[in-house]
Amino acid sequence: MGVIKKKRSHHGKASRQQYYSGVQVGGVGSMGAINNNIPSLTSFAEENNYQYGYSGSSAGMNGRSLTYAQQQLNKQRQDFERVRLRPEQLSNIIHDESDTISFRSNLLKNFISSNDAFNMLSLTTVPCDRIEKSRLFSEKTIRYLMQKQHEMKTQAAELQEKPLTPLKYTKLIAAAEDGSRSTKDMIDAVFEQDSHLRYQPDGVVVHRDDPALVGKLRGDLREAPADYWTHAYRDVLAQYHEAKERIRQKEVTAGEAQDEASLQQQQQQDLQQQQQVVTTVASQSPHATATEKEPVPAVVDDPLENMFGDYSNEPFNTNFDDEFGDLDAVFF
């Protein structure tokens, strides 16, 4: 279906701007002409002056003619707004070509490209040796990678051309290789350069002739008795277990004492808190203690109450809960 072109109508905002853009009138103000069908206030008044006995524009406009012209002009404006805002009929709605031209051009381009691709795939004979693999990287990416490779090679060459930075102990290493300095002198030189290091000369002490130290390190070298594994070993093992049990009991006793101390401390704290609460309540209600100390009068049975029976002990039941118990529970 072809698209029918139609003359573009004025937009609502543009038409209102055109409607209210007035022409400067001397002594009256700015009154705008909507279009050729809606005149201005001045021209409308001049045309209607003849109805009231005036002889043209030279006779001027009085207040009555201006009021009538203003009323007629307002009426024409209202009629114009009413016609402008009236909805169009569905049969008369036709799209403008500019609304669909971009979509149509894009659709036509896609159709032509897909048709060419399909024809190339179905009709064109391509030799197998002409079919090449697709590129893994685009040309832009390949150029970037080649540039980075060139920069890395340049940096490596520059590093090789730079002179070697002397190490911290270069002179000492050279002296050690030449043998011109003794080991002790080189060690002293290292400690002199690194002032944060410290050492103590002759710090190693050799105890070759100390029998007590040697005996402690070697242990007891005496031979065990013949009945060691039958009798002595059992005694040693029993002593070991007894010592271990004593240590355990001591730890348990210390733990129990600590728990009792913590429990007593907690009880004291609770007692202090209760005393504070009682003191606070007593200070807030001074008449409470006096009320509690007052004697309670004894209940004396009235003979008139027992005249018709002891109704106070009988259950009071009106069957209200059986009928309206659920309703009462809802409200209360």
Curated annotation (Swiss-Prot):
<dbReference type="GO" id="GO:0006357">
    <property type="term" value="P:regulation of transcription by RNA polymerase II"/>
</dbReference>
<feature type="short sequence motif" description="Nuclear localization signal">
    <location>
        <begin position="2"/>
        <end position="8"/>
    </location>
</feature>
<keyword id="KW-0010">Activator</keyword>
<feature type="modified residue" description="Phosphothreonine">
    <location>
        <position position="165"/>
    </location>
</feature>
<dbReference type="GO" id="GO:0000785">
    <property type="term" value="C:chromatin"/>
</dbReference>
<dbReference type="GO" id="GO:0006338">
    <property type="term" value="P:chromatin remodeling"/>
</dbReference>
<keyword id="KW-0597">Phosphoprotein</keyword>
<dbReference type="GO" id="GO:0006289">
    <property type="term" value="P:nucleotide-excision repair"/>
</dbReference>
<comment type="function">
    <text>Involved in transcriptional activation. Component of the SWI/SNF complex, an ATP-dependent chromatin remodeling complex, which is required for the positive and negative regulation of gene expression of a large number of genes. It changes chromatin structure by altering DNA-histone contacts within a nucleosome, leading eventually to a change in nucleosome position, thus facilitating or repressing binding of gene-specific transcription factors.</text>
</comment>
<dbReference type="GO" id="GO:0045944">
    <property type="term" value="P:positive regulation of transcription by RNA polymerase II"/>
</dbReference>
<keyword id="KW-0804">Transcription</keyword>
<comment type="subunit">
    <text>Component of the SWI/SNF global transcription activator complex. The 1.14 MDa SWI/SNF complex is composed of 11 different subunits: one copy each of SWI1, SNF2/SWI2, SNF5, SNF12/SWP73, ARP7/SWP61, ARP9/SWP59; two copies each of SWI3, SNF6, SNF11, SWP82; and three copies of TAF14/SWP29.</text>
</comment>
<dbReference type="GO" id="GO:0005634">
    <property type="term" value="C:nucleus"/>
</dbReference>
<dbReference type="GO" id="GO:0005829">
    <property type="term" value="C:cytosol"/>
</dbReference>
<protein>
    <recommendedName>
        <fullName>Transcription regulatory protein SNF6</fullName>
    </recommendedName>
</protein>
<feature type="region of interest" description="Disordered">
    <location>
        <begin position="278"/>
        <end position="299"/>
    </location>
</feature>
<dbReference type="GO" id="GO:0045943">
    <property type="term" value="P:positive regulation of transcription by RNA polymerase I"/>
</dbReference>
<dbReference type="GO" id="GO:0000470">
    <property type="term" value="P:maturation of LSU-rRNA"/>
</dbReference>
<keyword id="KW-0539">Nucleus</keyword>
<keyword id="KW-0805">Transcription regulation</keyword>
<dbReference type="GO" id="GO:0016514">
    <property type="term" value="C:SWI/SNF complex"/>
</dbReference>
<dbReference type="GO" id="GO:0000182">
    <property type="term" value="F:rDNA binding"/>
</dbReference>
